[in-house]
Amino acid sequence: MSLGKRFLRQPAVQRLLGRLAAAYLRLVRRTNRFVIQAGNAPPGKADAWLDAHTPLIAGMWHGQHIMMPLMRRPHDRVATIISRNVDGNINTIALEHLGTRVIRASGARGRSRATDMRAKGGAEGLRAMLRALKDGESVAFSADVPKVSRRCDAGILTLARLSGRPIVPAAVVTSRHLRFKSWDRACLGLPFGRGAIVLGDPIYVPRDSAGEAFETLRRFVETEMNRVHARAYALVGRADRAALYREAAPAAVAAPVGDAA
């Protein structure tokens, strides 16, 4: 193990980095002029729209996950799922300082990540998110297939199908930002600019949805997430450049496995 990795494994270092990350995101939120659009709600009615659809399942593209905490209102109860690794430890500390509850779960091994919610954090993670939604807590997480940018994973639809709660495509962007050269073209907002939080119309997944009907819904969610992100960037006067790097979509995924609740 390298010296750098050993350094990052120190609990004190992880706590410091997590707190610094939280402080930075607060700075971004406070120094950008944000506009909020929620579904078909008229201007100034986003709060009422959110209250009417809570608890909900907020889905973002992976490159936007850094900005996710900026969506949360002070009184919102929100949970997210984070892997059990060093990066996850730092992210957990940051998110908890920003008022988001974190579900820690291990990733799946030896099964198709494109077809099973368990790949987002194991059956334990799926059950934990179902419990959160049942208790009135919204959940938010990246919805794309790991390592395949902007390809909607079947998992978010599985969660919606089992819980009966709506998927809400979401995007948080700023006019000034850093774009990383990672597989997901992750984006980190910078202070002192314009910001946009855009939430799409709620999408419900019928309990009996399967096969081609399920796949049609999956593609619709993917399309809506792209539309919401494009709209958010348009509001801040920028192009959604990460869309240019979208990898070719693989063959259509199969319907998810049976209930895991």
Q: How does the language model describe each region?
A:
Residues M1-R72, D76, G99-T100, T223, ...:
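Membrane-anchoring hydrophobic helices of lipid-metabolizing enzymes
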Residues N32-V35, I57, T115-G121, P146:
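Short, flexible loop segments at the rims of nucleotide/cofactor-binding pockets, characterized by
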Residues G122-S163:
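Catalytic-site beta-strand/loop segments enriched in glycine and acidic/polar residues
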